[in-house]
Each structure stands twice: as structure tokens, then as C-alpha cells.
Amino acid sequence: MTMTDPIADMLTRVRNANMVRHEKLELPASNIKKQIAEILKSEGFIKNVEYVEDDKQGVIRLFLKYGQNNERVITGLKRISKPGLRVYAKANEVPKVLNGLGIALVSTSEGVITDKEARKRNVGGEIIAYVW
């Protein structure tokens, strides 16, 4: 069976693993998922990312991050642009998430970047998701 929305599947897997405090999770690899995983790592939402090559499409292994008292670092994930309703923003309309406490993932012609980076580079694009 083909997957309609692989990005929503990735976000749901991260959300579910985070809720039950799993240390790591695996998901099928794709270029956009790799870019999203790298952003989550650089923004401090996850500990580490590994790419495992197999004979098929490969696997991304995410290592989730928790605070000192085992509190969650990722408190929320929300898919914004969906296959049935795409959401785009111009460079000057890229939204802030929780007044800058969270990030918006923006798919641009320069790849997937955060909302802060999109404002800095003055580029717009498709608003993939919010993470806070």
C-alpha cells in the first residue's frame, strides 16, 4: 500500500515515540525526511540522527531527547500543509511559532529550512509543519 503523506507519518511516529518516552525510533528514509531530521537535530529537538543503508530505500534512526527529569523536549508537532490543502507563505508572511519558542519547517527552493532562516534569506515556500 502506498503512503499518502510520508511527512505526516514521520511526525506521527516522532510524536508517538515521544509520548511513551522511547529512546529511538526508525522510519523509512527519503531526502525531505533527512532534511527535516537534520533541522530537528540542529535546533536541539532530538539528540542524534543516523542513516542506515539497506537494499531498499534506507532507514532513518532518530534518537529522541529528554530533559533532566525525563520531561519531553518536543512538546508538540503539527502538520500544516497537507496533500489535500497545501499552505504557502511569501517571504514576508512566514509565521512565527509561539512567538519564536517553536519552529516552522518551510520547504523552499533552497531545501527545507526553519522559519528564522527563511526570514533571514528572504524566501517563502510551503509551510510543512510546526514543532515546539
Curated annotation (Swiss-Prot):
One Pfam family recorded for the sequence: Ribosomal_S8
Record keyword RNA-binding present: yes
GO cellular component: ribonucleoprotein complex; ribosome
Disulfide bonds: none
InterPro entries assigned: Ribosomal_uS8, Ribosomal_uS8_CS, Ribosomal_uS8_sf
Keywords: Ribonucleoprotein, Ribosomal protein, RNA-binding, rRNA-binding
GO biological process: translation
GO MF annotation: an example: structural constituent of ribosome
Xref: HAMAP family: Ribosomal_uS8_B (MF_01302_B)
Function: One of the primary rRNA binding proteins, it binds directly to 16S rRNA central domain where it helps coordinate assembly of the platform of the 30S subunit.
Family recorded in the similarity comment: Belongs to the universal ribosomal protein uS8 family.
Quaternary data: Part of the 30S ribosomal subunit. Contacts proteins S5 and S12.
NCBIfam families linked to this entry: PRK00136.1 (NF001109)
Protein name stated in the entry: Small ribosomal subunit protein uS8
